[in-house]
Design a protein with these regions (language model features):
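A short, sequence-level motif marking secondary-structure junctions
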Residues: 47-54, 88-93, 112-115
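Short, well-structured hydrophobic secondary-structure segments
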Residues: 43-80
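Short intrinsically disordered terminal tails
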Residues: 1-4, 131-132
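Short, surface-exposed beta-strand/loop "edge" segments at domain boundaries and coil↔beta transitions
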Residues: 41-45, 82-84, 101-109
Length: 132
């Protein structure tokens, strides 16, 4: 799996919080390591931009969040597989989910309260990569 669940055991069962941080925490020639921190824990996952342009996906996700769209995803792919962050829903209720390559859901967040905060966080991540 291209992600590591670094959360305390059993902390995901009632996670309805928005993400607190999404950042690139390591950069190598062929890989970016992302860390997603949310109310009950954190994930780390790797992406190889040569396999799939995850930064372009994140830019599209931020655009969709800001425009109120009801379905968008970002894919983070490396030699070991992929992680998909998915946003879906309608009107004022959105569900955010994280899936591994086998399609198993990894708990993430839910609720419209996180929409703009998540878009802002993604924009900050993208700006940091432009400066790198």
């Amino acid at each position: 799996m291209p992600y590591q669940d670094a959360s305390p055991a059993g902390q995901h069962f009632m996670n309805f919080s928005r993400p607190l941080a999404l950042a690139v925490v390591a950069r190598a020639a062929d890989a970016l390591t992302f860390e997603l921190i949310y109310g009950f824990g954190q994930y780390r996952f790797d992406a190889d931009p040569a396999r799939h342009d995850c930064l372009a996906d994140l830019a599209q996700m931020a655009d969709a969040l800001e425009a109120g769209h009801d379905h968008v995803e970002a894919v983070f792919r490396d030699a070991d597989g992929e992680i998909r962050l998915l946003l879906q829903g309608d009107d004022d209720v959105l569900q955010f989910a994280c899936y591994d390559g086998a399609g198993s859901v990894l708990p993430w967040l839910q609720g419209d309260a996180g929409r703009y905060a998540t878009a802002r966080m993604i924009r900050e991540l993208l700006a940091s990569q432009d400066a790198a």
